[in-house]
Amino acid sequence: MKSSFWIQNDSRQEGEYKRPLSRKSAPYKFVVVGGGTAGAIVSTWLKAYWGDSVEVVVVYNHAEPNIGIGESLTPMMITYLERVGIQPQELIKDCNATVKLGLKFKNWTGDGSHFYHPFACLADRWNSYGFEGAYGVVNGCYDNDDTYGNNILEENKVPTNIFNEGSYTLHIDGVLTSKYILDKYKDRLTIIDDIIVDITKDKNGHIQQVIGNKGEYDGDFFIDATGFKKLLFKKLDNNKWLDTSDWLPLNRCIPNPIFREHKTIPVTTTSEATDNGWILQVPLRNRIGAGYLFSTEFTSDQEALDKFDIFLQENYDTNLSSDKIIPFESGYWHDQWIGNCMCVGLSSGFTEPLEATNVHHVIFQMQDFTNRFNFKIFQFDIDNYNQVMRDFYDRVYLFLRYCYDSGRVDSDFWKYMTYERPEKIKTLSDKISEDFLNTDSFPSFSIFNHDNFFKVTNGHGKCNKESYSKILEDRGVWDQAQQHHNELQQLKHYIYRSSIDHKEFLETI
């Protein structure tokens, strides 16, 4: 029951031969700068993919803390874990991870209501034109979850066979997980504790060495995983940062862990809209990773701190533990591979964590890079890779911006998001509210497909039932849609009966 949308195919499967070196000298040497989530994923992916054909050096300051809000992921993380030979159960046992079945949007229409955006769709094979979902909307019985059903999400249950057949991912503690992953590979990686301060380049502009306080490190290929610092990429020439703050103006996050004993553990990440942004709530086994995202264009830092403190008091009976605020830039590098250097994760760009796309992007980058790279740098590969990554970000920003298209106008922030919509959002909204999208609406590699846009549109209450009904009748698929809908409900009922409480499920691992 793999999602056709969250998980991209990797042409090389486990157990296949290791790619031979294109030269007879020493193994090709990758130097990864950064040891956070992105650095850990990249270095272990490279080693798992190429084995002894490569040497992977990871350099980072071991004393520097990561952001550590708590990572909400997509099923792409399961693809990564399979590649590097780590079981999801390991992260649950040792890193406070929990199961994630989707996302809960709360108060995005301003009335306190909520809707779910789950991952896969059991109806996908037949529902490529959205017929089953449209039938459910017309008849008032569509619950936005074509896989498990809202009962499982509302009651925080997990199918007992989730690891074998389910479409799922994890909520993780990013700090613990990156340490765990690197420790698993400590005998296969060269891990160095140092602070990188500069680089040297050859006459072609390629990096020769990265320079740290303790030493200099040469390599064949360098990867910038330094997060918001963008340490290597800021020193490269002929690149530009594409600012997307006109689409997504949020530029601050207030992190605050909530330590409490769970009576029950949610199976969804909650994104709760406020009058000037939204609050992220990621359930881990030992805490809730929370963060308040807002824009300084519409509220001051102090106002945001005060509002977040009130929210924590009212919802969790606790107070804001610090006044730490993390600034960020909404945007991405036009080119994310230049010469013999690539940027990954937050070094390559930032999208607010509404749909957990940042870690997804790291893994997608590694899939694309390792599938096309054979230890020799060609401009053709660079150009194609960069175009793929620009397209990725374009699709992400389109979907994230569409999530704000709920019609709220109860504050200056929401008036801006509603009245100052980009033209692409206007035309998309006009289309999908009257006529459903299909598999041909977006490129096949797109991270978000027709089903995702449909679920958000329905969650916002913007689907036109009369128009949908007429389309089903005109296409002559009403009876077929009804039959498929009924079959899907039976299957969801079966899955529900084989599910148990999330907290109880975690305790069995």
What are the functions of these language-model segments?
Residues 114-180, 184-185, 193, 225, ...:
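Low-complexity, highly charged intrinsically disordered N-terminal segments
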Residues 47-69:
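Glycine-rich FAD pyrophosphate-binding loop
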Residues 166-304, 366:
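Predominantly flavin-linked oxidoreductase catalytic cores and closely associated redox partners
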Residues 331-396:
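Conserved mid-domain beta->alpha element of the FAD-binding
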Residues 65-154:
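Dinucleotide-binding Rossmann-like beta1-alpha1 core, especially the glycine-rich loop
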Residues 28-54:
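N-terminal Rossmann-like FAD-binding beta1-loop-alpha1 element of flavoenzymes
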Residues 274-327, 349-360, 375-378:
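Conserved FAD/dinucleotide-binding core of flavoprotein oxidoreductases
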Residues 371-509:
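Long, low-complexity C-terminal extensions of enzymes
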